[in-house]
Amino acid sequence: MFEPIKRDLHLSDAQLGWLGSAYIIVLSLSALPLGVIGDLRSRRLVITWGVAVWSAATTAGGIARQFWQLFTCRALVGFGEAGYAPASQAIIAQYYKGRRRAFAIGIYSVGMALGGVLGIWFGGVIAERYGWRWAFIWMGVPGLVLALLASRLRELDRRPPPPIAETLREWWRHGMHGVTHYVMPLAICAGIGAALAGFLSLFEGIPSQFGTALFGIGTSVGIAWTVWRLVPLAVRRTTEAGAVAAGAFDDFQDAAILVLRTPTLIWIFLGGAMVTFAVNGLIAWAAAFMERIHGLSVARVGGQFGLWALTGGVAGALVGGRMADRLQQRWRGGRVLTSGAGFVLGAPVCAALLLVHDLRWFGPLILATYFLYTWYNGPLAAVILDVVPPAVQATVLGAFVLFSHLAGDALAPPLIGYLSDRTGDLRTAMLLLPAVGLLGGLVILIALRTVARDVRRVTSLDIHVSGQGEAES
Protein backbone atom coordinates (compact mmCIF):
# COMPACT_ATOMS: atom_id res chain seq x y z
CA MET A 1 0.00 0.00 0.00
CA PHE A 2 3.01 2.33 0.29
CA GLU A 3 2.94 3.65 -3.25
CA PRO A 4 -0.77 4.68 -3.50
CA ILE A 5 -0.63 6.14 0.03
CA LYS A 6 2.50 8.09 -0.90
CA ARG A 7 0.83 9.55 -3.99
CA ASP A 8 -2.47 10.36 -2.27
CA LEU A 9 -1.05 11.95 0.89
CA HIS A 10 2.12 13.35 -0.76
CA LEU A 11 4.54 11.59 1.60
CA SER A 12 8.29 11.01 1.45
CA ASP A 13 9.92 7.59 1.83
CA ALA A 14 11.00 8.56 5.34
CA GLN A 15 7.38 9.35 6.29
CA LEU A 16 6.27 6.03 4.85
CA GLY A 17 8.85 4.35 7.03
CA TRP A 18 7.55 6.13 10.10
CA LEU A 19 4.06 4.81 9.43
CA GLY A 20 5.53 1.36 9.95
CA SER A 21 7.49 2.46 13.01
CA ALA A 22 4.41 4.04 14.63
CA TYR A 23 2.89 0.58 14.72
CA ILE A 24 6.06 -1.15 15.85
CA ILE A 25 7.11 1.31 18.57
CA VAL A 26 3.70 1.34 20.25
CA LEU A 27 3.46 -2.45 19.93
CA SER A 28 6.87 -2.78 21.57
CA LEU A 29 6.15 -0.44 24.47
CA SER A 30 2.73 -1.98 25.12
CA ALA A 31 3.69 -5.66 24.85
CA LEU A 32 5.30 -5.96 28.27
CA PRO A 33 2.54 -4.34 30.39
CA LEU A 34 -0.15 -6.20 28.44
CA GLY A 35 1.80 -9.42 28.92
CA VAL A 36 1.85 -8.77 32.67
CA ILE A 37 -1.90 -8.09 32.62
CA GLY A 38 -2.40 -11.37 30.77
CA ASP A 39 -0.44 -13.25 33.44
CA LEU A 40 -2.12 -11.48 36.34
CA ARG A 41 -5.68 -11.25 35.06
CA SER A 42 -6.83 -12.98 31.86
CA ARG A 43 -4.97 -13.79 28.66
CA ARG A 44 -8.30 -14.41 26.93
CA LEU A 45 -9.51 -10.86 27.59
CA VAL A 46 -6.18 -9.37 26.46
CA ILE A 47 -6.54 -11.22 23.16
CA THR A 48 -10.21 -10.29 22.72
CA TRP A 49 -9.78 -6.57 23.31
CA GLY A 50 -6.54 -6.50 21.34
CA VAL A 51 -8.18 -7.94 18.23
CA ALA A 52 -11.08 -5.50 18.57
CA VAL A 53 -8.82 -2.44 18.93
CA TRP A 54 -6.49 -3.23 16.05
CA SER A 55 -9.39 -4.11 13.74
CA ALA A 56 -11.22 -0.87 14.52
CA ALA A 57 -8.01 1.14 14.05
CA THR A 58 -7.32 -0.54 10.70
CA THR A 59 -10.80 0.39 9.52
CA ALA A 60 -10.34 3.96 10.74
CA GLY A 61 -7.12 4.21 8.73
CA GLY A 62 -9.23 4.10 5.59
CA ILE A 63 -10.75 7.50 6.36
CA ALA A 64 -7.49 9.25 7.33
CA ARG A 65 -6.85 12.44 5.35
CA GLN A 66 -3.52 13.56 6.78
CA PHE A 67 -0.24 11.95 7.74
CA TRP A 68 -0.75 12.38 11.49
CA GLN A 69 -4.19 10.76 11.33
CA LEU A 70 -2.87 7.66 9.57
CA PHE A 71 0.13 7.68 11.93
CA THR A 72 -2.26 7.61 14.91
CA CYS A 73 -4.29 4.76 13.42
CA ARG A 74 -1.15 2.71 12.85
CA ALA A 75 -0.09 3.37 16.44
CA LEU A 76 -3.46 2.07 17.69
CA VAL A 77 -3.05 -1.03 15.54
CA GLY A 78 0.25 -1.61 17.33
CA PHE A 79 -1.41 -1.23 20.72
CA GLY A 80 -4.10 -3.74 19.79
CA GLU A 81 -1.60 -6.30 18.55
CA ALA A 82 0.79 -5.81 21.49
CA GLY A 83 -0.86 -8.26 23.85
CA TYR A 84 -1.89 -10.77 21.21
CA ALA A 85 1.36 -12.64 20.57
CA PRO A 86 2.48 -13.07 24.22
CA ALA A 87 -0.96 -14.09 25.46
CA SER A 88 -1.66 -16.38 22.49
CA GLN A 89 1.66 -18.17 22.71
CA ALA A 90 1.29 -18.56 26.47
CA ILE A 91 -2.11 -20.22 25.95
CA ILE A 92 -0.61 -22.51 23.30
CA ALA A 93 2.15 -23.40 25.77
CA GLN A 94 -0.55 -24.48 28.24
CA TYR A 95 -1.92 -26.99 25.75
CA TYR A 96 1.44 -28.17 24.37
CA LYS A 97 3.97 -28.65 27.16
CA GLY A 98 6.12 -31.33 25.55
CA ARG A 99 8.08 -32.03 22.42
CA ARG A 100 5.48 -30.62 19.96
CA ARG A 101 5.55 -27.09 21.34
CA ALA A 102 7.64 -25.55 18.54
CA PHE A 103 5.42 -27.16 15.89
CA ALA A 104 2.27 -25.90 17.61
CA ILE A 105 3.62 -22.35 17.74
CA GLY A 106 4.71 -22.81 14.13
CA ILE A 107 1.10 -23.50 13.14
CA TYR A 108 0.10 -20.34 15.01
CA SER A 109 2.78 -18.46 13.03
CA VAL A 110 1.38 -19.91 9.80
CA GLY A 111 -1.93 -18.26 10.63
CA MET A 112 -0.20 -14.93 11.09
CA ALA A 113 1.76 -15.36 7.86
CA LEU A 114 -1.37 -16.45 6.03
CA GLY A 115 -3.29 -13.41 7.22
CA GLY A 116 -0.45 -11.05 6.39
CA VAL A 117 0.11 -12.36 2.88
CA LEU A 118 -3.60 -12.63 2.08
CA GLY A 119 -3.96 -9.07 3.35
CA ILE A 120 -1.32 -7.94 0.86
CA TRP A 121 -2.91 -10.03 -1.89
CA PHE A 122 -6.55 -9.05 -1.43
CA GLY A 123 -5.61 -5.58 -0.30
CA GLY A 124 -3.77 -5.07 -3.57
CA VAL A 125 -6.78 -6.23 -5.58
CA ILE A 126 -9.15 -3.97 -3.62
CA ALA A 127 -6.75 -1.02 -3.84
CA GLU A 128 -6.41 -1.47 -7.60
CA ARG A 129 -10.18 -1.42 -8.14
CA TYR A 130 -11.52 0.83 -5.38
CA GLY A 131 -8.51 2.62 -3.86
CA TRP A 132 -6.30 2.01 -0.83
CA ARG A 133 -8.86 3.45 1.60
CA TRP A 134 -11.37 0.69 0.89
CA ALA A 135 -8.60 -1.87 1.28
CA PHE A 136 -8.04 -0.67 4.86
CA ILE A 137 -11.75 -0.71 5.62
CA TRP A 138 -12.37 -4.19 4.26
CA MET A 139 -9.26 -5.60 5.97
CA GLY A 140 -10.39 -4.27 9.36
CA VAL A 141 -14.04 -5.33 9.48
CA PRO A 142 -13.51 -9.15 9.71
CA GLY A 143 -11.35 -8.69 12.80
CA LEU A 144 -14.30 -7.33 14.75
CA VAL A 145 -16.07 -10.65 14.18
CA LEU A 146 -12.95 -12.59 15.20
CA ALA A 147 -12.82 -10.62 18.44
CA LEU A 148 -16.16 -12.18 19.42
CA LEU A 149 -14.78 -15.65 18.67
CA ALA A 150 -11.65 -14.92 20.71
CA SER A 151 -13.82 -14.22 23.74
CA ARG A 152 -14.73 -17.94 23.73
CA LEU A 153 -11.14 -19.12 24.28
CA ARG A 154 -10.52 -21.35 27.29
CA GLU A 155 -7.41 -21.17 29.47
CA LEU A 156 -6.00 -24.18 31.30
CA ASP A 157 -4.50 -24.40 34.77
CA ARG A 158 -5.16 -20.77 35.69
CA ARG A 159 -5.73 -19.79 39.27
CA PRO A 160 -8.50 -17.22 39.79
CA PRO A 161 -6.99 -13.72 39.95
CA PRO A 162 -7.50 -11.53 43.01
CA PRO A 163 -10.47 -9.14 42.83
CA ILE A 164 -9.75 -6.02 40.79
CA ALA A 165 -10.84 -3.78 43.66
CA GLU A 166 -8.34 -5.48 45.99
CA THR A 167 -5.55 -5.08 43.45
CA LEU A 168 -6.34 -1.38 42.98
CA ARG A 169 -6.38 -0.81 46.75
CA GLU A 170 -2.96 -2.41 47.08
CA TRP A 171 -1.55 -0.32 44.24
CA TRP A 172 -3.00 2.84 45.84
CA ARG A 173 -1.56 1.93 49.24
CA HIS A 174 1.93 1.56 47.83
CA GLY A 175 1.74 5.18 46.64
CA MET A 176 3.97 7.13 44.31
CA HIS A 177 7.05 6.42 46.43
CA GLY A 178 6.99 2.77 45.45
CA VAL A 179 6.29 3.59 41.83
CA THR A 180 9.18 6.06 41.71
CA HIS A 181 11.52 3.53 43.30
CA TYR A 182 10.65 0.77 40.85
CA VAL A 183 10.70 2.81 37.62
CA MET A 184 13.78 4.92 38.37
CA PRO A 185 15.97 2.87 35.95
CA LEU A 186 13.47 3.57 33.17
CA ALA A 187 13.56 7.31 33.89
CA ILE A 188 17.38 7.34 33.96
CA CYS A 189 17.85 5.44 30.68
CA ALA A 190 15.09 7.33 28.87
CA GLY A 191 16.62 10.59 30.08
CA ILE A 192 20.06 9.59 28.79
CA GLY A 193 18.53 8.62 25.44
CA ALA A 194 16.68 11.94 25.22
CA ALA A 195 19.85 13.87 26.13
CA LEU A 196 21.87 12.09 23.43
CA ALA A 197 19.09 12.72 20.91
CA GLY A 198 19.06 16.41 21.83
CA PHE A 199 22.85 16.57 21.50
CA LEU A 200 22.73 15.07 18.01
CA SER A 201 20.07 17.59 16.99
CA LEU A 202 22.65 20.36 17.45
CA PHE A 203 24.61 19.12 14.44
CA GLU A 204 23.44 19.71 10.89
CA GLY A 205 23.27 16.80 8.51
CA ILE A 206 22.39 14.19 11.14
CA PRO A 207 18.84 12.91 10.45
CA SER A 208 16.26 13.02 13.21
CA GLN A 209 15.76 9.26 12.86
CA PHE A 210 19.03 8.61 14.65
CA GLY A 211 17.97 10.73 17.61
CA THR A 212 14.67 8.88 17.78
CA ALA A 213 16.53 5.58 17.60
CA LEU A 214 18.76 6.56 20.54
CA PHE A 215 15.73 7.53 22.62
CA GLY A 216 13.98 4.25 21.72
CA ILE A 217 17.02 2.15 22.62
CA GLY A 218 17.47 4.00 25.90
CA THR A 219 13.82 3.47 26.76
CA SER A 220 13.94 -0.25 25.96
CA VAL A 221 17.08 -0.72 28.07
CA GLY A 222 15.42 1.18 30.92
CA ILE A 223 12.32 -1.01 30.77
CA ALA A 224 14.45 -4.17 30.75
CA TRP A 225 16.41 -2.86 33.75
CA THR A 226 13.20 -1.97 35.57
CA VAL A 227 11.75 -5.44 35.00
CA TRP A 228 15.05 -6.95 36.16
CA ARG A 229 14.56 -5.23 39.51
CA LEU A 230 10.78 -5.43 39.79
CA VAL A 231 9.97 -9.06 39.01
CA PRO A 232 12.25 -10.65 41.64
CA LEU A 233 10.68 -8.31 44.20
CA ALA A 234 7.16 -9.01 43.00
CA VAL A 235 7.47 -12.75 43.40
CA ARG A 236 8.50 -12.51 47.05
CA ARG A 237 5.25 -12.86 48.93
CA THR A 238 6.75 -11.23 52.03
CA THR A 239 7.11 -7.88 50.25
CA GLU A 240 4.43 -5.32 49.46
CA ALA A 241 4.88 -5.89 45.74
CA GLY A 242 4.45 -9.59 46.33
CA ALA A 243 1.07 -8.99 47.93
CA VAL A 244 -0.15 -7.59 44.62
CA ALA A 245 1.28 -10.27 42.33
CA ALA A 246 1.24 -13.33 44.59
CA GLY A 247 -1.79 -14.81 42.86
CA ALA A 248 0.09 -15.06 39.57
CA PHE A 249 3.67 -15.67 40.71
CA ASP A 250 2.89 -18.02 43.60
CA ASP A 251 5.76 -20.42 44.39
CA PHE A 252 7.86 -19.28 41.41
CA GLN A 253 10.29 -16.95 43.19
CA ASP A 254 13.46 -18.79 42.22
CA ALA A 255 12.21 -19.54 38.71
CA ALA A 256 11.32 -15.90 37.98
CA ILE A 257 14.73 -14.71 39.19
CA LEU A 258 16.33 -17.32 36.96
CA VAL A 259 14.41 -16.05 33.91
CA LEU A 260 16.01 -12.62 34.08
CA ARG A 261 19.48 -14.07 34.65
CA THR A 262 19.48 -16.68 31.91
CA PRO A 263 22.32 -16.31 29.35
CA THR A 264 20.23 -17.97 26.66
CA LEU A 265 17.66 -15.18 26.86
CA ILE A 266 20.36 -12.55 26.36
CA TRP A 267 21.42 -14.04 23.02
CA ILE A 268 17.83 -14.73 21.96
CA PHE A 269 16.80 -11.14 22.71
CA LEU A 270 19.78 -9.60 20.89
CA GLY A 271 19.56 -11.91 17.89
CA GLY A 272 15.78 -11.61 17.85
CA ALA A 273 16.03 -7.83 17.45
CA MET A 274 18.34 -8.22 14.46
CA VAL A 275 16.30 -10.86 12.64
CA THR A 276 13.11 -8.91 13.31
CA PHE A 277 14.80 -5.91 11.70
CA ALA A 278 15.54 -8.02 8.62
CA VAL A 279 12.19 -9.80 8.29
CA ASN A 280 9.84 -6.91 8.94
CA GLY A 281 11.98 -4.47 7.01
CA LEU A 282 11.62 -6.76 4.00
CA ILE A 283 7.87 -7.11 4.53
CA ALA A 284 7.43 -3.33 4.87
CA TRP A 285 9.26 -2.44 1.65
CA ALA A 286 8.77 -5.51 -0.58
CA ALA A 287 5.67 -4.21 -2.36
CA ALA A 288 7.20 -0.77 -3.01
CA PHE A 289 10.37 -2.49 -4.23
CA MET A 290 8.43 -4.55 -6.77
CA GLU A 291 6.49 -1.52 -8.01
CA ARG A 292 9.53 0.74 -8.41
CA ILE A 293 12.27 -1.66 -9.48
CA HIS A 294 10.22 -4.09 -11.56
CA GLY A 295 7.36 -1.81 -12.61
CA LEU A 296 4.52 -4.02 -11.36
CA SER A 297 1.01 -2.71 -10.65
CA VAL A 298 -0.51 -2.81 -7.16
CA ALA A 299 -2.77 -5.74 -8.08
CA ARG A 300 0.06 -7.70 -9.71
CA VAL A 301 2.29 -7.08 -6.71
CA GLY A 302 -0.37 -8.64 -4.49
CA GLY A 303 -0.64 -11.71 -6.71
CA GLN A 304 3.06 -12.08 -7.53
CA PHE A 305 4.33 -11.39 -4.04
CA GLY A 306 1.40 -12.93 -2.18
CA LEU A 307 1.42 -16.36 -3.82
CA TRP A 308 5.16 -16.96 -3.53
CA ALA A 309 5.52 -15.43 -0.06
CA LEU A 310 2.50 -17.32 1.25
CA THR A 311 3.80 -20.64 -0.03
CA GLY A 312 7.29 -20.05 1.33
CA GLY A 313 6.12 -18.63 4.65
CA VAL A 314 3.64 -21.40 5.40
CA ALA A 315 6.06 -24.14 4.37
CA GLY A 316 8.91 -22.54 6.30
CA ALA A 317 6.95 -22.15 9.53
CA LEU A 318 5.72 -25.75 9.41
CA VAL A 319 9.04 -27.26 8.36
CA GLY A 320 10.96 -25.14 10.86
CA GLY A 321 8.70 -26.11 13.75
CA ARG A 322 8.74 -29.81 12.86
CA MET A 323 12.49 -29.87 12.25
CA ALA A 324 13.19 -28.04 15.51
CA ASP A 325 11.09 -30.47 17.53
CA ARG A 326 12.76 -33.48 15.89
CA LEU A 327 16.22 -32.09 16.60
CA GLN A 328 15.17 -31.15 20.12
CA GLN A 329 14.36 -34.79 20.90
CA ARG A 330 17.99 -35.69 20.23
CA TRP A 331 19.71 -32.50 21.40
CA ARG A 332 18.74 -29.59 23.64
CA GLY A 333 19.99 -27.07 21.10
CA GLY A 334 17.72 -28.23 18.27
CA ARG A 335 15.34 -25.28 18.42
CA VAL A 336 18.14 -22.73 18.72
CA LEU A 337 19.97 -24.28 15.75
CA THR A 338 16.86 -24.19 13.57
CA SER A 339 16.14 -20.54 14.44
CA GLY A 340 19.64 -19.27 13.71
CA ALA A 341 20.37 -21.47 10.70
CA GLY A 342 17.36 -20.14 8.80
CA PHE A 343 18.85 -16.65 8.72
CA VAL A 344 22.41 -17.77 8.04
CA LEU A 345 21.18 -19.73 5.01
CA GLY A 346 18.54 -17.16 4.05
CA ALA A 347 20.75 -14.06 3.97
CA PRO A 348 22.47 -14.81 0.62
CA VAL A 349 19.13 -15.85 -0.88
CA CYS A 350 17.57 -12.55 0.24
CA ALA A 351 20.50 -10.63 -1.24
CA ALA A 352 20.01 -12.44 -4.56
CA LEU A 353 16.31 -11.57 -4.41
CA LEU A 354 17.15 -7.88 -4.19
CA LEU A 355 19.81 -7.98 -6.91
CA VAL A 356 18.08 -10.13 -9.54
CA HIS A 357 16.71 -8.35 -12.63
CA ASP A 358 14.87 -11.23 -14.28
CA LEU A 359 11.31 -11.55 -12.98
CA ARG A 360 11.34 -15.26 -13.78
CA TRP A 361 13.75 -15.74 -10.88
CA PHE A 362 12.07 -13.24 -8.60
CA GLY A 363 9.15 -15.46 -7.56
CA PRO A 364 11.22 -18.55 -6.66
CA LEU A 365 13.65 -16.35 -4.72
CA ILE A 366 10.76 -14.83 -2.75
CA LEU A 367 9.60 -18.34 -1.91
CA ALA A 368 13.08 -19.45 -0.84
CA THR A 369 13.68 -16.31 1.23
CA TYR A 370 10.42 -16.58 3.12
CA PHE A 371 10.85 -20.32 3.52
CA LEU A 372 14.18 -19.86 5.31
CA TYR A 373 13.25 -16.64 7.11
CA THR A 374 10.22 -18.27 8.77
CA TRP A 375 12.00 -21.27 10.26
CA TYR A 376 12.41 -19.29 13.48
CA ASN A 377 8.71 -18.46 14.03
CA GLY A 378 7.86 -21.41 16.26
CA PRO A 379 11.28 -22.51 17.56
CA LEU A 380 12.48 -19.14 18.85
CA ALA A 381 9.37 -18.59 20.98
CA ALA A 382 9.60 -22.22 22.11
CA VAL A 383 13.18 -21.65 23.31
CA ILE A 384 11.98 -18.76 25.48
CA LEU A 385 9.13 -20.86 26.83
CA ASP A 386 11.55 -23.72 27.54
CA VAL A 387 13.51 -21.58 30.00
CA VAL A 388 10.59 -19.66 31.53
CA PRO A 389 8.25 -20.82 34.34
CA PRO A 390 4.62 -21.10 33.19
CA ALA A 391 3.30 -18.34 35.46
CA VAL A 392 5.35 -15.61 33.76
CA GLN A 393 5.47 -16.85 30.17
CA ALA A 394 3.29 -14.09 28.70
CA THR A 395 5.26 -11.48 30.64
CA VAL A 396 8.63 -12.66 29.34
CA LEU A 397 7.30 -13.04 25.80
CA GLY A 398 6.00 -9.49 26.12
CA ALA A 399 9.48 -8.36 27.16
CA PHE A 400 10.89 -10.13 24.10
CA VAL A 401 8.37 -8.41 21.84
CA LEU A 402 9.27 -5.08 23.45
CA PHE A 403 13.00 -5.43 22.96
CA SER A 404 13.06 -7.17 19.59
CA HIS A 405 10.68 -4.71 17.97
CA LEU A 406 11.85 -1.49 19.61
CA ALA A 407 15.54 -2.27 19.05
CA GLY A 408 14.86 -4.07 15.76
CA ASP A 409 12.16 -3.46 13.22
CA ALA A 410 11.04 -0.14 14.71
CA LEU A 411 14.24 1.16 13.12
CA ALA A 412 14.01 -0.76 9.84
CA PRO A 413 11.23 1.02 7.86
CA PRO A 414 12.37 4.62 8.53
CA LEU A 415 16.05 3.75 8.16
CA ILE A 416 15.48 2.04 4.80
CA GLY A 417 13.33 5.01 3.77
CA TYR A 418 16.02 7.48 4.83
CA LEU A 419 18.74 5.56 2.95
CA SER A 420 16.48 5.39 -0.10
CA ASP A 421 15.91 9.16 0.00
CA ARG A 422 19.63 9.84 0.38
CA THR A 423 20.91 7.37 -2.24
CA GLY A 424 17.96 7.61 -4.62
CA ASP A 425 17.98 3.82 -4.91
CA LEU A 426 15.64 1.62 -2.87
CA ARG A 427 17.55 -1.51 -3.95
CA THR A 428 20.79 -0.28 -2.39
CA ALA A 429 19.02 0.69 0.83
CA MET A 430 17.34 -2.70 1.20
CA LEU A 431 20.62 -4.61 0.91
CA LEU A 432 21.14 -3.69 4.56
CA LEU A 433 18.39 -6.18 5.49
CA PRO A 434 20.10 -9.50 4.63
CA ALA A 435 23.33 -8.29 6.24
CA VAL A 436 21.58 -7.59 9.55
CA GLY A 437 19.65 -10.87 9.27
CA LEU A 438 22.88 -12.83 8.86
CA LEU A 439 24.38 -11.18 11.93
CA GLY A 440 21.22 -11.90 13.93
CA GLY A 441 21.29 -15.57 12.96
CA LEU A 442 24.89 -15.87 14.14
CA VAL A 443 24.05 -14.19 17.46
CA ILE A 444 21.17 -16.62 18.03
CA LEU A 445 23.52 -19.54 17.41
CA ILE A 446 25.71 -18.39 20.31
CA ALA A 447 22.86 -19.56 22.57
CA LEU A 448 23.81 -23.14 21.62
CA ARG A 449 26.50 -22.87 24.30
CA THR A 450 24.04 -22.13 27.12
CA VAL A 451 20.57 -23.43 26.29
CA ALA A 452 21.01 -27.01 27.56
CA ARG A 453 22.21 -25.83 30.95
CA ASP A 454 19.46 -23.23 31.24
CA VAL A 455 16.71 -25.72 30.36
CA ARG A 456 18.01 -28.17 32.96
CA ARG A 457 18.07 -25.49 35.64
CA VAL A 458 14.48 -24.39 34.99
CA THR A 459 13.27 -27.99 34.76
CA SER A 460 14.89 -28.89 38.07
CA LEU A 461 13.44 -25.75 39.65
CA ASP A 462 9.95 -26.66 38.41
CA ILE A 463 10.29 -30.16 39.86
CA HIS A 464 11.54 -28.71 43.15
CA VAL A 465 8.64 -26.24 43.40
CA SER A 466 6.05 -28.93 42.51
CA GLY A 467 7.48 -31.32 45.08
CA GLN A 468 7.48 -28.64 47.73
CA GLY A 469 3.84 -27.84 47.01
CA GLU A 470 2.83 -31.51 47.31
CA ALA A 471 4.69 -31.83 50.61
CA GLU A 472 2.91 -28.80 52.04
CA SER A 473 -0.49 -30.14 51.00
How would you describe each model-predicted region?
Residues L29-W68:
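Conserved MFS/SLC helix-loop-helix module at the cytosolic interface between two early adjacent transmembrane helices
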Residues R332-L380:
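C-terminal transmembrane helical hairpin of 12-TM major facilitator-type secondary transporters
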